[in-house]
Design a protein with these regions (language model features):
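Extracytoplasmic/lumenal domain signature
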Residues: 1-10, 40-77, 110-148, 153-163
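Repeat-blade elements of multi-bladed beta-propeller folds
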Residues: 11-35, 75-105, 109-111, 121, ...
Length: 166
């Protein structure tokens, strides 16, 4: 008997979203979370191809958000959170914003109790450092395969009489 965790990681990763070229970097998102791996985004140097930073959408122990994977068997290791669709880039704020998919296994929320951050979320990362700037989780402990796969439209909109970036 084997599990997704026993299969080499590279055999379980893939890409469906087009990359974003911005600020001298190529932003790519891993999108094969249904195969039992954690989603991630990476920035590659356009000239050298070297990885500048990588951030996972499902946090490991000790990282912010891992406490929302409230199990005793390491469900975060195969947690999902893929980036199915190309994100957005805000050049002025130097942010890239992407939507993440459901947690895995998707139809077994009891295997992965808790909110399962940062699955089914909008996530914004600093393009230079990869630091998470903000997030919003649409459906905690999502088990219906909703995903957050829409492209985030970035606009200036009035709020209480003041234009705000939204």
């Amino acid at each position: 008997k084997s599990s997704a965790a026993d299969t080499p990681r590279m055999d379980r990763e893939g890409f469906t979203a087009a990359p974003i070229a911005a600020a001298g970097k190529l932003l790519v998102g891993q999108s094969k979370g249904d195969a039992g791996t954690r989603g991630w985004i990476a920035a590659l140097d356009i000239e050298t191809g070297e990885e500048v930073w990588r951030q996972y959408t499902v946090p490991a122990p000790g990282e912010f958000g891992n406490e929302t994977w409230a199990d005793d068997h390491g469900a975060w290791k195969t947690g999902g959170g893929s980036l199915w669709t190309t994100g957005s880039y805000d050049a002025e704020q130097r942010l890239t914003i992407w939507g993440t998919a459901q947690p895995v296994p998707m139809f077994d929320p009891e295997f992965r109790p808790g909110d399962n951050l940062f699955t089914n979320s909008a996530m914004a990362w600093d393009i230079d450092t990869g630091a998470l700037k903000y997030y919003f989780q649409y459906t905690p402990n999502e088990s219906w395969d909703y995903d957050e796969n829409g492209v985030h439209m970035l606009i200036d909109a009035p709020f209480n009489g003041v234009d705000r970036k939204t």
